[in-house]
């Protein structure tokens, strides 16, 4: 395959260490703009510009399109570092970057249409559930639907939308992922939320639009072996790792960074505080030390846990292996349990802020809101994600068309 003629910035020479350094360098800048993102209910232009200039939307985009094509552990690490500055920024980058990796499943024609003129082009999504409905027409499908939680849609020229294809009798005959240009969908300004406001995760809709076959990829019934045309174009085993089993790890990265920010801010606050009556240093209280220690241990444990999942999966695919059902369910279990521990850590730290933490201008208040809002994501539901792994461990059988 010939490399496309890339006119925007080319980040193919940026390695893992440099990419992580770029993300780390943005932390102070992101903290300065976090409140602005929160109020705008989307990333402000200055933040989007900085991310583009540093190539941080493109850390797992193929090198042939000017992306960094980093190892899969970056799937967690880059959002984690950005999340230390602002959870919403880390979350949006995690989502939009993951769609760069996902586009590699589509045929070359689709990749050329989206990235041919501008590899910086971003793709948002409505894929958590197949909320669209489609019928077969000549050359493609006719798609109608309404998809919620499309993070970063304000900055994206395309949408990746999931749908169920039905026959004339209404019977499901396929499940497809569709790449849809901005001109064919409508964004509803409905993102008024408790937290994660800066993600701008709005609802998108479309009515009876035509999606050609080359942009409507079969994910299940018509493609039981999950043999995707785009994988023939990209040799890196990272692109073969199934998103369904590790999809939550990138956004969990952002929220691990958010919890780390809570730890850092609380630690700095404790070093400076003393009691009003006795002047005793807050840092000398053993109860305070215990809380800091417990929160830090939980955050470090989750970081190690989820990074190890990413490393393990990539190492397996490097040698031509594939994930077992047990491994896929274990990764999903780890992601959900990890978020539970992160919420506990942030709660512990927020309690230490006392009355000062309840003000709108308190970074800890936003961090607290963001952590709890993010925990509502289906990937982090312990009820949904822990029991399937246990079911298999106990000798049961777990079936899912999308896993």
Sequence positions of predicted segments:
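C-terminal helix-coil-helix/basic helical segment that borders enzyme active sites and/or dimer interfaces
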Residues: 31, 35-38, 301-337, 350-358
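Glycine-rich flavin
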Residues: 43-53, 57-157, 171-173
